[in-house]
């Protein structure tokens, strides 16, 4: 073998050496890329499944453990939702046959007195101390507007056992007529609802009343339009 042939063989071997050594490195790099892609897809699939089935999700609101950080009304509502339905409750409706007055009845459909509440002298008597939701609605109806201004009032009052004085808890005034119906013009009907509601601390034996000033304008055409009630919280 000549010297030139030996030199040519060495050069060919040197050129072939990088290609041979690059082969395993390229294979290893491809293997790592495949593994990374597989783990990425598997992780995304697992996360989707956990979100879909509710295993993980947005953090739920938690009530503070310290009772002093919760408002009294919130504590009462939470306590009410956890206890049996033995709390005082009342829902009375207006008597459509009582002319010229607003008379409450409990012996009617969708009316009730439960767990100690009494209806005496057209007033609801509170059976126990605590927070109560008090509410009432009336619906007035008229035809046309007279010359004198029509003012409709609706008031919920309390007579407490501690001081025996009538005090207004909730009150509202509305005027359905802005101007008098012109002479000869058609007297169009009008409707005016008034709703009152609020939460109050009451004592055992307190009496509550819901009154209006113009009972002749009350609308009894449909049931469920005029009512009065309390719910212990």
Curated annotation (Swiss-Prot):
GO molecular function (one): death receptor agonist activity
Lipid-linked residues (N6-myristoyl lysine): 20
Sugar-modified residues: 80
Gene3D superfamilies attached to this UniProt entry: 2.60.120.40
Segments on the Cytoplasmic face: 1-35
Record note on modification: The soluble form derives from the membrane form by proteolytic processing. The membrane-bound form is further proteolytically processed by SPPL2A or SPPL2B through regulated intramembrane proteolysis producing TNF intracellular domains (ICD1 and ICD2) released in the cytosol and TNF C-domain 1 and C-domain 2 secreted into the extracellular space. The membrane form, but not the soluble form, is phosphorylated on serine residues. Dephosphorylation of the membrane form occurs by binding to soluble TNFRSF1A/TNFR1.
Segments passing through the bilayer: 36-56
Biological processes annotated in GO: antiviral innate immune response; cellular response to amino acid stimulus; cellular response to ionizing radiation; cellular response to lipopolysaccharide; cellular response to nicotine; cellular response to type II interferon; chronic inflammatory response to antigenic stimulus; defense response to Gram-positive bacterium
InterPro entries: TNF (IPR006053), TNF_alpha (IPR002959), TNF_CS (IPR021184), TNF_dom (IPR006052), Tumour_necrosis_fac-like_dom (IPR008983)
Record's bilayer topology term: Single-pass type II membrane protein
Keyword annotations: Cell membrane, Cytokine, Disulfide bond, Glycoprotein, Lipoprotein, Membrane, Myristate, Phosphoprotein, Secreted, Signal-anchor, Transmembrane, Transmembrane helix
Functional summary from the UniProt entry: Cytokine that binds to TNFRSF1A/TNFR1 and TNFRSF1B/TNFBR. It is mainly secreted by macrophages and can induce cell death of certain tumor cell lines. It is potent pyrogen causing fever by direct action or by stimulation of interleukin-1 secretion and is implicated in the induction of cachexia, Under certain conditions it can stimulate cell proliferation and induce cell differentiation. Induces insulin resistance in adipocytes via inhibition of insulin-induced IRS1 tyrosine phosphorylation and insulin-induced glucose uptake. The TNF intracellular domain (ICD) form induces IL12 production in dendritic cells.
Subunit annotation: Homotrimer. Interacts with SPPL2B.
Name this protein carries in UniProt: Tumor necrosis factor
Organism: Macaca mulatta (Rhesus macaque)
Upper taxonomic lineage: Eukaryota, Metazoa, Chordata, Craniata, Vertebrata
